[in-house]
């Protein structure tokens, strides 16, 4: 809109001298007044366009396409994917993650937004619905060589006394069923970095012995890279990299949602560059946060600001990583977590409130 007005301005003033030179002085003064009124009207429209929150909606194609190159054969933009919709324990978003047609449509839509992989929240075989949804997603992705999937292993909190053994069992299942040489043809859809499969870790238990787990995974024929949420001082040698995760920062959750995690992101990226240059750094971008629809809600908010939060979070990433020192991956957090309001599937700007959740509850697709 602004570009259109600017073009009109240029057209007016490029012809102004020539046009006015051909008319009498009195008429010239009247023309000046008319033109002045026209320009003032246009400026008012420009100011109104800038003042309305949704006039500057984020265009993910423009916002995300400017990142540096990814390693050959690896997707650069990944999105966290929640596979639990379609069961009664979660809100109705108008689709089931067990519907192959829905999964194919989501992959196609993600690619339109320059996202080339889903990192699927995965709990191991203990949550059968989510495990089946993961398998269906990997199968759908296998039909498109340009799109990949990976697991974000969500550690359990109900294995007191044998946390490490439980994690080993889960990861062995993941490897055998979806990653390893016996996993079947859909294994080609699994995300790899420099030829090695990537597993993201969402930790829950502090008693898990990740050094022991790493010894086990290194013994596999196709050993994976383990990417941990934030940094781990306790097990620095157990992980190949770290990823940032949506949070408000050191000042915590503000009542007005104004804390969007800027200080946390600055610390994460600076710490990765200064103290972990040998590790894989995975950046993050999020549109906001609102867990009011979740059954576990704690009334936590990060204001969306009609796309401004998304832009600000992305700008912090760009301060530290560009074409000269590209991070291999940037995580969009998330694709479809409507219950915590981090979804970008239907709305990045969330103008007028949590429009993603509202359209989801209405069953829009």
Question: At which residue positions do the language-model features occur?
Answer:
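N-terminal secretory signal peptides that target proteins for export/translocation
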Residues: 1-32
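Residues at the start of alpha-helices and the adjacent loop-to-helix junctions
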Residues: 22, 33-36, 71, 102
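Bacterial N-terminal signal peptides
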Residues: 35-49
